[in-house]
């Protein structure tokens, strides 16, 4: 597996069902806020994501990760301030490890992998 840059850039990800849940939640809530950040509030290094995904979907194999230093690292960190969402009572429900399996199984079921 080859990752761009050094794999140290940090990213926040959210499972699609949690995002959909947040959209419905806040449409029903009818807040006066123009913008409410939706996220998990947790970020990991890209190389950590890669390792977590590999361990979940192919735990029996050792996959080596290479880093392509000719490619950019990207912005050092992308994580949202989700305090306003929490204030209104919303939080993501799906752990990243569960999201990996749900997503992987969906792709297998649809013969997309």
Which residue ranges define each predicted feature?
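C-terminal substrate-binding subdomain of Rossmann-fold SDR/epimerase-dehydratase oxidoreductases
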Residues: 1-113
